[in-house]
UniProtKB/Swiss-Prot annotation:
InterPro entries xref list: DNA-bd_curved-DNA (IPR023859), DnaJ_C (IPR002939), DnaJ_domain (IPR001623), DnaJ_domain_CS (IPR018253), HSP40/DnaJ_pept-bd (IPR008971), J_dom_sf (IPR036869)
Gene name of the record: cbpA
Name of the protein: Curved DNA-binding protein
Domain J: 5-69
Task performed by this protein: DNA-binding protein that preferentially recognizes a curved DNA sequence. It is probably a functional analog of DnaJ; displays overlapping activities with DnaJ, but functions under different conditions, probably acting as a molecular chaperone in an adaptive response to environmental stresses other than heat shock. Lacks autonomous chaperone activity; binds native substrates and targets them for recognition by DnaK. Its activity is inhibited by the binding of CbpM.
Swiss-Prot/TrEMBL keywords: Chaperone, Cytoplasm, DNA-binding
Originating species: Pseudomonas putida (strain ATCC 47054 / DSM 6125 / CFBP 8728 / NCIMB 11950 / KT2440)
Length: 319
């Protein structure tokens, strides 16, 4: 088992605050998002970033990782957890998901609170022989909230004998529909889909906690989506038609003459769906991007414009 230095994975210092850690995670999640990155190992790096944020984004796990880091583990080098460490996890163990053996050996008894690809935790029930409930954090991409197709999930459930004693774990696979209007952190109950009961007891339930995966193009505000639309200066000045991506295909957006950076254009019905299936808005936020003036002809054009244009962007300073 190799040691994983989660600070190195996210590219932050051990002294980084919560804001810096979250920003680093979002940057990597966007860069290696499976829908965007063409790198061969993008999915693995995406999962690795999620695992790092699962630990460093949780104060308790981060403190424990900092403690075990003192034992001299080096990133990518063989590592063995100190004797007795695993016992700190307490009751039923966390099994697999997409987290590494290193994570499981250090936090084996804890839940997988932020794993966007899913990770089960078992909650021990003391009453009767009812099967254990299983908690699964499930990554949902924005496109999936509009899809009518089922999503296949796999997770670990504990097995018990007739005496209610745990005998091991088994993998269970389900096809689930993502309901319209789901939001980050929402908890969905699937009755009877948890661990089997013993001695004729009822099955436990499966609880899905939705985690909306970061998208490389869109930010989310409620059921509205925000996309930044880069414009050339002449497009903003003269007006243009620009092809803008949405969750269900591109649209042609009309840019009016004299548009400014920061302006928002509303596109009705191109946001996320609510519980009733009604969709929010897409807001296209304009951003004027300056081209490089690296060659002589470009500089001549800018020089002529500066000489002929009666424009002072700082007139408010003279008031």
């Amino acid at each position: 088992m190799d040691f994983k230095d989660y600070y190195k994975i996210l590219g932050v210092e051990p002294t980084a605050d919560e804001k810096a850690i979250k920003a680093a995670y979002r940057k990597l999640a966007r860069k290696y998002h499976p829908d965007v990155s063409k790198e061969r190992d993008a999915e693995e790096k995406f999962k690795e970033a999620n695992e790092a944020y699962e630990v460093l984004g949780d104060a308790q796990k981060r403190a424990e990782f900092d403690e075990i880091r003192k034992y001299g583990g080096q990133h990518g080098r063989p590592f063995q957890a100190p004797p007795g460490w695993e016992s700190r996890g307490g009751g039923g163990g966390f099994e697999g998901g997409d987290f590494s053996d290193f994570f499981s050996s250090i936090f084996g008894g804890r839940s997988a609170g932020g794993n966007p690809f899913g990770g089960a935790r078992q909650q021990q029930r003391s009453a009767g022989r009812r099967g254990q409930d299983v908690e699964l954090e499930l990554a949902v991409f924005l496109e999936e909230t509009l899809s009518k197709e089922s999503k296949q999930i796999s997770f670990q459930v504990p097995q018990t004998n007739a005496m209610g004693q745990r005998t091991g774990f088994t993998t269970k696979t389900l096809n689930v529909r993502i309901p319209a209007g789901v939001t980050d952190g929402e908890r969905i109950r699937l009755k009877g889909q948890g661990a089997p009961g013993s001695g004729g007891g009822a099955n436990g339930d499966l609880f899905l906690t939705i985690r909306m995966a970061p998208h490389p193009l869109f930010d989310v505000e409620g059921h509205d989506l925000i996309i930044t639309v880069p414009l050339a200066p002449w497009e903003a000045a003269l007006g243009a038609k620009v092809a803008v991506p949405t969750l269900d295909g591109k649209i042609n957006l009309t840019i009016r003459p004299d548009s400014q950076s920061g302006q928002r254009l509303r596109v009705p019905g191109k946001g996320l769906a609510n519980k009733q299936g009604e969709r929010g808005n897409l807001y296209a936020q304009l951003k004027v991007v300056m081209p490089p003036a690296s060659d002589e002809s470009a500089r001549e054009l800018w020089t002529k414009l500066s000489e002929k244009a009666a424009f002072n962007p700082r007139t408010q300073w003279s008031k």
